[in-house]
């Protein structure tokens, strides 16, 4: 089926960063087959014409690191540093999770992402007490594109660790699909929660199954000091010695990196998921994204979980990301709007290995969102589209969401997720947690 979306301002995020005023795109099944100015196609050659009436059309946003199973933990443990936050609030609460609660929490995260314009995401979930197959089915039913990864920890006995590795390997073999809508990565939590043996086993699983790796790394000064004290190496060098960087790897955070480490990461195709709001809220610091990009590192913007953010609004992340770089470098040209948009779309898609999405171009997957600026004073005058998307817009402005050619949300109404039921169940299950 061919559908033409017409009368829109098209923000392509292609190599030339072209913006087509009064443009159109044609989608055939799941794929964009034409992007142009004006209305120069034969209407009898398409099955449906959708008039967007002046809306802005742009690539769906790509969240490179989050934890949607934690969505019910929003607002838990505010104003705490990372380590005590994890040890005294998050992990104890996650041990109370049931399969039903985890699904309700996941649905809440999916709903929030769709309504705020995210079409693709990379996730890590703690498998304790949950049904991983139910989580994957829930994501699949939402219509979103995702890499959903089972997190590994070295908690408990050596036998517990061995079982965790076996279960993770089964999960990877079951769900890894290179070009599917739903895939996975090998996801050891971090160098401070995984033993050397577990990290080496994760490297083996990734190599044998040709998967990517997703890990928290160099997030805080404390982490760097602790790993250096324990292993005689900084986190980047230590993880490299475990073999994980033999496969394309996404490190979440990368707040505490020196120049040599940035050069090393670029040379080994290690990508960074940048979580500006989460890093600020947990007092972890500010990642030097400008230096990363100059070193040649692929960077994608991310939200982290709602427990440390406290939302999944990628527009907000774009804005704070660019403002932070301008501020810490005292350079107003640092991370300009075009770059910020790329780090939340095309660049982010490359970070998580999904080059089939992230821009409005012929041959790309039909993943896009729209915003109607007409009745929004904060988006007027409407001519400066790129500026407004980064510095003025929010996820609440999103009108329509199309993923893989399918209308997932239209005029603010979700078609694959029951908003009323999801919010009701989220409230019900939250009351069951012993805070």
From Swiss-Prot:
It catalyses: S-adenosyl-L-homocysteine + H2O + H(+) = S-inosyl-L-homocysteine + NH4(+); S-methyl-5'-thioadenosine + H2O + H(+) = S-methyl-5'-thioinosine + NH4(+). The keyword Zinc applies. GO terms for molecular function: 5'-methylthioadenosine deaminase activity; metal ion binding; S-adenosylhomocysteine deaminase activity. Its cofactor is Zn(2+). Substrate binds at residues 94, 150, 189, 219, 304. InterPro entries: Amidohydro-rel, Deaminase_MtaD/DadD, Metal-dep_hydrolase_composite, Metal_Hydrolase, MTA/SAH_deaminase. Binds 1 zinc ion per subunit. Zn(2+) binds at residues 65, 67, 216, 304. SUPFAM superfamilies: Composite domain of metallo-dependent hydrolases, Metallo-dependent hydrolases. Keywords: Hydrolase, Metal-binding, Zinc. It comes from the Bacteria. Gene3D superfamilies: Metal-dependent hydrolases (3.20.20.140), Urease, subunit C, domain 1 (2.30.40.10). The keyword Hydrolase applies. Its EC number is 3.5.4.28, 3.5.4.31. Belongs to the metallo-dependent hydrolases superfamily. MTA/SAH deaminase family. Catalyzes the deamination of 5-methylthioadenosine and S-adenosyl-L-homocysteine into 5-methylthioinosine and S-inosyl-L-homocysteine, respectively. Is also able to deaminate adenosine. PANTHER family: AMIDOHYDROLASE-RELATED DOMAIN-CONTAINING PROTEIN, AMINOHYDROLASE SSNA-RELATED. This is 5-methylthioadenosine/S-adenosylhomocysteine deaminase. It comes from Bacillus cytotoxicus (strain DSM 22905 / CIP 110041 / 391-98 / NVH 391-98).
């Amino acid at each position: 089926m061919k559908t033409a979306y017409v009368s829109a301002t098209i923000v392509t995020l292609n190599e030339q960063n072209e913006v087509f005023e009064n443009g159109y795109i044609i989608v055939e099944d799941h794929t964009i087959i034409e992007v142009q100015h004006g209305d120069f196609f034969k209407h009898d050659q398409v099955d449906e014409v959708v008039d967007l009436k002046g809306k802005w059309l742009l690539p769906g946003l790509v969240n490179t690191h989050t934890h949607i199973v934690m969505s019910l933990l929003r607002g838990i443990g505010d104003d705490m540093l990372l380590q005590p936050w994890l040890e005294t609030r998050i992990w104890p609460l996650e041990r109370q999770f049931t399969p039903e609660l985890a699904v309700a929490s996941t649905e809440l995260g999916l709903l929030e992402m769709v309504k705020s314009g995210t079409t693709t995401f990379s996730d890590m979930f703690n498998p304790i007490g949950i049904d991983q197959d139910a989580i994957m089915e829930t994501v699949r039913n939402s219509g979103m594109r995702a890499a959903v990864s089972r997190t590994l920890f070295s908690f408990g006995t050596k036998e517990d660790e061995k079982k965790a590795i076996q279960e993770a390997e089964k999960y990877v073999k079951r769900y890894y699909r290179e070009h599917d809508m739903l895939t996975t990565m090998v996801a050891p939590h971090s160098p401070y929660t995984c033993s050397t043996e577990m990290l080496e086993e994760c490297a083996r699983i990734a190599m044998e199954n040709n998967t990517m790796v997703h890990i928290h790394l160099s997030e805080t000064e404390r982490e760097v000091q602790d790993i250096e004290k324990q292993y005689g190496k900084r986190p980047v060098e230590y993880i490299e010695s475990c073999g994980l960087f033999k496969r394309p790897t996404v490190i979440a955070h990368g707040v505490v990196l020196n120049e040599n480490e940035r050069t090393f990461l670029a040379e080994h195709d290690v990508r960074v998921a940048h979580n500006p709001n989460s890093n600020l809220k947990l007092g972890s610091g500010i990642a030097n994204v400008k230096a990363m990009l100059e070193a040649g590192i692929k960077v994608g913007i991310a939200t982290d979980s709602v427990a440390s953010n406290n939302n999944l609004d990628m527009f907000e992340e774009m804005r704070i990301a660019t403002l932070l770089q301008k501020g810490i470098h005292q350079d107003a040209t640092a991370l300009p709007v075009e770059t910020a948009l790329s780090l939340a779309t095309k660049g982010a898609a490359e970070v998580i290995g999904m080059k089939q999405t992230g821009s409005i171009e012929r041959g790309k997957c039909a993943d896009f969102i729209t915003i109607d600026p007409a009745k929004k004073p904060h988006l007027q005058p409407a001519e400066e589209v790129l500026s407004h998307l980064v510095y003025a817009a929010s996820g609440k402005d999103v009108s329509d969401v199309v993923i893989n050619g399918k209308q997932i949300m239209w005029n603010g109404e979700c078609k694959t997720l029951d908003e009323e039921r999801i919010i009701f169940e989220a409230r019900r299950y939250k009351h069951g947690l012993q805070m």
